Amino acid sequence: GDPDQLPSVGAGNVLGDLLRSGVVPAVSLTEIFRQAEKSAIIRNAHAVNLGQSPELKNTQNDFFFLCRRAPDRLVQTVVELCQKRLPENMGIPADQIQVLSPTRKGVCGTVNLNRALQAALNPPAASKRQKPWGDMVFREGDRVMQTRNNYDVVWERDDGAMGAGIFNGDVGVIQEIDP
């Protein structure tokens, strides 16, 4: 496990408790392979772990901070970043960007952000089927994330691989909606 990741959602802290007990052998890895050595993400993560403030003024690298006080302006900025600015300025395709929000409700919550991003990145088209679900609309081409474990779903990939179960955090793209 990673001691710097978010804690468990449910009760308990099994991994942390086991490591602190000293009963289970543990090794700490110090070399980072996911980001480049000169990554501002890495530098700022280390700074935060040491109780220091991250560098927020440099917007020319892989870590930057944009202050938005009005919630509507924040949503507009997120849409601009995903639709135009990150793909054009950093070469990151929109389908590789993940937006995190600490809440579901409100102007800046996941429900509203998802609606705004869907309208910008995957608008309705005659060639795309869609399905209303409660107060949401799912559309072919939408990126989706599973929010609860479902062990009973049987799935098949394009390459023929099959399996059962989809799990909290699994991400995919809606390929087809049955008529």
In which residue ranges do the predicted regions lie?
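Conserved helicase motor core of P-loop NTPases
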Residues: P3-A164
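Conserved beta-strand residues within beta-sheet cores
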Residues: R143, N168-V171
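A generic structural signal for residues embedded in beta-strands
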Residues: Q146, I174-I177
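Conserved beta-strand and immediately adjacent loop positions that scaffold enzyme active sites
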Residues: Q98, V171-V173
